[in-house]
Regions:
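Non-catalytic, surface-exposed connector residues within folded enzymatic/regulatory domains
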Residues: 35, 72, 91-93, 126
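Glycine-rich, flexible loop/turn motifs
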Residues: 37, 43, 86-89, 96, ...
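Leloir-type glycosyltransferase catalytic cores
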Residues: 94-141
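Gly/Pro- and small hydrophobic-enriched strand-loop and loop-to-helix capping segments
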Residues: 74-102
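Donor-binding and catalytic core of enzymes assembling or modifying cell-surface/extracellular glycoconjugates
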Residues: 1-83
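Short, structured secondary-structure boundary patches
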Residues: 33-38, 86, 100-105
Length: 141
């Protein structure tokens, strides 16, 4: 989020009520001066509202989720982050999408000792902000 804000983007974090804490963690990792440019909308929007907001975004960065597929349907530039789920089975159906995935193969459900205590698969942890920024830049070129 910090790198995107430094490039002039404002950040909207979407999700359900169960994602509020994760959204706040993301927001709180930002320097205080940048926090006003990151709004945690998790649990605060209806699906219709989220779709409307996503449709107006300059670029979307999303994990493999329902909102990622909505973003793909809006034909907005999209960076789709895949961990243990497979884009072979659930790809974003858009020619304006870049898929980032650090592992090969199909659906991987096995938890590994290198996964975080919060349950984040190591393959998602391995996706760096630099990887995401490179994809965003290529979509904006």
């Amino acid at each position: 989020a910090e790198m995107l804000i430094e490039q002039g983007y404002a950040i909207m974090l979407f999700g359900s009520a169960k994602d509020v804490d994760v959204g706040e963690q993301i927001r709180n990792t930002l320097p205080e001066a940048l926090q006003p440019f990151c709004v945690n909308l998790a649990g605060q929007t209806s699906l219709d509202q989220a779709v409307d907001l996503i449709a107006h975004c300059a670029v979307i960065v999303s994990n493999d989720s329902g909102l990622m597929h909505i973003a793909a349907a809006t034909s907005r530039p999209l960076v789709a982050l895949y961990g243990p789920t497979s884009p072979t089975y659930t790809p974003p159906l858009s020619d304006k999408a870049i898929i980032l995935r650090k592992i090969e193969g199909g659906l991987l459900k096995v938890r590994k000792s290198t996964d975080s205590a919060e349950g984040y698969h190591q393959s998602l942890i391995d996706l760096s902000p630099q990887d995401v920024m490179e994809a965003v830049r290529s979509l904006q070129a």
